Every structure is written in structure tokens, then in C-alpha cells.
UniProtKB/Swiss-Prot annotation:
Signal among keywords: yes
High-level lineage: Bacteria, Pseudomonadati, Pseudomonadota, Gammaproteobacteria, Enterobacterales
Name by which UniProt lists this protein: Glutathione-binding protein GsiB
Recorded superkingdom: Bacteria
Stored PANTHER family: GLUTATHIONE-BINDING PROTEIN GSIB (PTHR30290:SF32), PERIPLASMIC BINDING COMPONENT OF ABC TRANSPORTER (PTHR30290)
Places the protein is found: Periplasm
Role of this protein: Part of the ABC transporter complex GsiABCD involved in glutathione import. Binds glutathione.
Stored PROSITE patterns: SBP_BACTERIAL_5
GO terms, biological process: dipeptide transport
Segment forming the signal sequence: 1-26
Gene name of the encoded protein: gsiB
Species name: Shigella flexneri serotype 5b (strain 8401)
Pfam families xrefs: SBP_bac_5 (PF00496)
Keywords from the UniProt entry: Periplasm, Signal, Transport
Length: 514
């Protein structure tokens, strides 16, 4: 009898021990619900922040930015710049391997920068690297990069998430298909990419930082509908969600299992107007449209207060000495109608308004803007695009074939400095498909000021040049600047170390599930 009790006790103890072991070794799998799909897993060929953010699962750069957008070393240990501003010498960390076993060294850096700076490769991010004359591997841990001309923002180019280090072995093996076969030095490696549904990454056992990563897997799942994204958090289907529907922020805040985060951003939302096409070639029309939009009302209707009306073309938090603020456009539909009449459009006109995203917040902005424009006689046919449509119809077409007229989108300067907040959007050479000047704006003075600002390291001179460029842009109004967003994300309280960067990218290297 005693033996029977003893055996049953052992069985019970065994079951309990097994359960405890099961709990102790339960897989740490995290699902992240994001607002749109991914275009590619090749960061050098992606124009959208989300694709580059997900690519950080696999890839790392020489340098990066911390939460305060300050420079930090990643795969590099240090750098020096020659007195003439032409040569950058970078010292690399030792003992790091790519996920395919290839050594990370100066030869690997050269392979990546040679690829990025070669126009024959037709990479979307070529413009970041076109000033590189040559890259040399001096020894295994020393790289020398020589520029064609002084470029004071170059170290910030190496900070940009596009400047990821890809295994040269993988580059040679996969060629143009590298976007489907990512191989980097990052904490995770690709498990599955279902292009219509999700990207799943798994822990890279050979990661060079001890004790990391702490998660076993991350599944990045595009969910266009804001409400569905929030619901996934509440049901436990997702552990992190961004962006959070602003109107649901208060509700989520009350959930004891969820933590809501609202943080500052460098994401500016705006509507560009194609100034090469009628009626947007007329400055009075562009001025009228700026008067036609009630920005404080837009902040309430579409962003539930989690944004501020834009007061310039560069968000104030980017390179504060260079970002200029102006008197906000007042809402004045009467003035808008007067200007339209002066421009030869007393009865308004018809046009198209496209959006670079199709999530619920973008839909609200489109509807609000459509109604506002209608009040001054402008009939706008709206289209909310997914990532594939945007890449094909906006990013992939030049001025002559482009159907862009009015285009609602956003930009965050992921280099953390002023040039990348201005040149890709306003320089004449950066019309699509080169970069993202979707207004097809061109002004020689602006081009000259932006170019001169990159040739000086004098902060006072930079301030003068960037101010002069912004003054002209603000006066000529190729945009309707709308708002600077606050970033609202939410996560399960048992998820730590996972947060949103000011440029809307993700930081998750230290993420853990308790």
C-alpha cells in the first residue's frame, strides 16, 4: 500500500516536473502586427521604412542610432575623417561571422559598398552611395572609403538602415535574388516569408553578442486594418502592434495586460502636388490648397490628438539647428476660393489623390482631405495604395509616365540629419524613380544650397544654407505639409526591450518575453 502511494507520488511528481520544465523551456515566440506589407528584404533596394525595419532582424550596419537618435558603434569600433573631408577610415570589430559562416571583415564591407555605389545595379538606395569613389580593404579590420567630393553627412549615410552588411558569399550566390535570401550578422535569420501574409525569423545561434537574442522567433504580420491590429493585442494573437489606432489608445490603456507607448517622432505627413502638371504648376493653386485644409481638425479626426500641425518641411526634432519653423497655414476656405479664382479655376477642378498606405488612419486622412477640398470646389478621386502598388505606380515611374497628381505620404530621415530630410524630397535629381521627390519639384537655388551645405562642416554656414533652401521651398509650396506624428504602439506587458524608433523603425535586439 505504501509502495502504491509512493509510485503514484512519483508519477505526480514526474508530471509536475515535466510541466515545470515545459513552462521553463516554452518557446519565446512573438508576433508583431504592423500596418502594411513588405516590398523586399534587401535594404539597399527598399524605399519604405517598414521593409528596412524588418530587415534589421537579419542585418546590421557599421553604425546605428540609439533612442535619442545619437550615433552608436555596431559592427564598427571607430572611424576617422581626413582633414579634406574626402577619406573615411573605419575600424571593424573582430570575430564576427555572417549567418552562413562567412567572416565579417573589410572585404565584406567593400563588397557591400561596391555593390551599393554601382549605378549598374539599379538599387533604389543608390543615391545614398553615389558619392563613393572607391572602397578599399586595408587589412581585415580596416576599411578606407574615398569620396568623390567632401560630403559632411557621410557618416550618417553609414548609419542609415539601408547600409546593412550582407554576406558577400550570399551576394555572389543569390545575386539579384538576395532580397528573398537575407544573410547578415543580425540576431535572427529567415525562417519563412509568405509574401502575402508574414515574415517569420528565428534565433541565430551564432550571434556575436553573448546572451542575445532572448526570443526564439519573431513573426512580422502585416495587418492593414487598425482595429484588427488592436484586437490581436487584446486576444493575445500579437504581443506588439504598431501603429495603434489613435481612437483606441484610451481603451488599450485601461487593459491591465497591455502597455501603451506614445513617443516623439521624425515622421512628417504631407501631400505632395505634381508641380509639372496642371493645375499644380500654378503657385496660386498650391497656395489655395494649403489654405483649404484645417490641420488642427485633421489632428483630432484622423490622429485623435496624437500629432501636431506641421510648421515646416523638416520635423523640428531633426538636426534642430537646421529645421526651420514658419507661421502655420491658417484654415481659410474663403481665401482658398479667391486664389483658385485668380488662378483661373473659379469652379474648382477635378484631380486624383493617392495615398502611399491603405491602413485605417491613411483612409481617414484621405476622406477628411477629400471633404475639405470639396468645400472649395475641388473634386478629388482618392486611392489608398498597398506597398506593391506604391512601388509600381509611384516609386517606379518617372515624370513623363507618372500618374501622380496629389500624393499623401510621409517621410522620416533615418540618417538623423537635415540633408536626408530635404534632398530626397526636393532636389531636382531626386524625382522618381531615383528617389522620392513626388512633387517633381525643381529649383536651381535650392539644389545649390543643399549641395553647398554638404561641403562645409561649419554649423553656422550649414544653418544659413539649409534655412535659405527651406525658405524657398516653403514659399513655393510644392507640398501641403500636414502633421508630425506621435508614434503610438502597444505591447503585452510580458514583452520587454521592444520599442519604436523616432523614424518609425523598430529596436528589438534586447527583446524578451517574461
Amino acid at each position: 500500500m505504501a509502495r502504491a502511494v509512493h509510485r503514484s507520488g512519483l508519477v505526480a511528481l514526474g508530471i509536475a516536473t515535466a510541466l515545470m520544465a515545459s513552462c521553463a523551456f516554452a518557446a519565446k515566440d512573438v508576433v508583431v502586427a504592423v500596418g502594411s506589407n513588405f516590398t523586399t528584404l534587401d535594404p539597399y533596394d527598399a524605399n519604405d521604412t517598414l521593409s528596412q525595419a524588418v530587415a534589421k532582424s537579419f542585418y546590421q550596419g557599421l553604425f546605428g542610432l540609439d533612442k535619442e537618435m545619437k550615433l552608436k558603434n555596431v559592427l564598427a569600433e571607430s572611424y576617422t575623417v581626413s582633414d579634406d573631408g574626402i577619406t573615411y577610415t573605419v575600424k571593424l570589430r573582430e570575430g564576427i561571422k555572417f549567418q552562413d559562416g562567412t567572416d565579417f571583415n573589410a572585404v565584406a564591407v567593400k563588397a557591400n559598398l561596391d555593390r551599393a555605389s554601382d549605378p549598374a545595379n539599379h538599387l533604389k538606395r543608390y543615391n545614398l552611395y553615389k558619392n563613393i569613389a572607391k572602397t578599399e580593404a586595408i587589412d581585415p579590420t580596416t576599411v578606407k572609403i574615398t569620396l568623390k567630393q567632401p560630403f559632411s553627412a557621410f557618416i550618417n549615410i553609414l548609419v542609415h538602415p539601408a547600409t546593412a552588411m550582407i554576406s558577400p558569399t550570399a551576394l555572389e550566390k543569390y545575386g539579384k535574388e538576395i532580397g528573398f535570401h537575407p544573410v547578415g550578422t543580425g540576431p535572427y535569420e529567415l525562417d519563412t516569408w509568405n509574401q502575402t501574409d508574414f515574415v517569420k525569423v528565428k534565433k541565430f545561434a551564432g550571434y556575436w553578442q553573448p546572451g542575445l537574442p532572448k526570443l526564439d522567433s519573431i513573426t512580422w504580420r502585416p495587418v492593414a486594418d487598425n482595429n484588427t491590429r488592436a484586437a490581436m493585442l487584446q486576444t493575445g494573437e500579437a504581443q506588439f502592434a504598431f501603429p495603434i489606432p489613435y481612437e483606441q489608445a484610451t481603451l488599450l490603456e485601461k487593459n491591465k495586460n497591455i502597455e501603451l507607448m506614445a513617443s516623439p517622432s521624425i515622421m512628417q505627413r504631407y501631400i505632395s502636388m505634381n508641380v509639372t502638371q496642371k493645375p499644380f504648376d500654378n503657385p496660386k493653386v498650391r497656395e489655395a490648397l494649403n489654405y483649404a485644409i484645417n490641420r488642427p481638425a485633421l489632428v483630432k479626426v484622423a490622429f485623435a490628438g496624437y500629432a501636431t500641425p506641421a510648421t515646416g518641411v523638416v520635423p523640428p526634432s531633426i538636426a534642430i539647428a537646421y529645421a526651420q519653423s514658419y507661421k502655420p497655414w491658417p484654415y481659410d476656405p474663403v481665401k482658398a476660393r479667391e486664389l483658385l479664382k485668380e488662378a483661373g479655376y473659379p469652379n474648382g477642378f477635378s484631380t486624383t489623390l493617392w495615398s502611399s498606405h491603405n491602413h485605417s488612419t491613411a483612409q481617414k486622412v484621405l476622406q477628411f482631405t477629400q471633404q475639405q477640398l470639396a468645400q472649395v470646389g475641388i473634386k478629388a478621386q482618392v486611392t489608398a495604395m498597398d506597398a506593391g502598388q506604391r512601388a509600381a505606380e509611384v516609386e517606379g515611374k518617372g515624370q513623363k509616365e507618372s500618374g501622380v497628381r496629389m500624393f499623401y505620404t510621409g517621410w522620416s530621415a533615418s540618417t538623423g540629419e537635415a540633408d536626408w530630410a530635404l534632398s530626397p524630397l526636393f532636389a531636382s535629381q531626386n524625382w522618381p524613380p531615383t528617389l522620392f521627390n513626388t512633387a517633381f519639384y525643381s529649383n536651381k537655388q535650392v539644389d545649390d544650397f543643399l549641395a553647398q551645405a554638404l561641403k562645409t562642416n561649419d554649423p553656422a554656414e550649414k544653418t544659413r544654407l539649409y534655412k535659405a533652401a527651406q525658405d524657398i521651398i516653403w514659399q513655393e509650396s510644392p507640398w501641403i505639409p500636414l502633421v508630425v506624428e506621435k508614434l503610438v504602439s502597444a505591447h503585452s506587458k510580458n514583452l520587454t526591450g521592444f520599442w519604436i524608433m523616432p523614424d518609425t523603425g523598430f529596436s528589438f535586439e534586447d527583446a524578451d518575453l517574461q
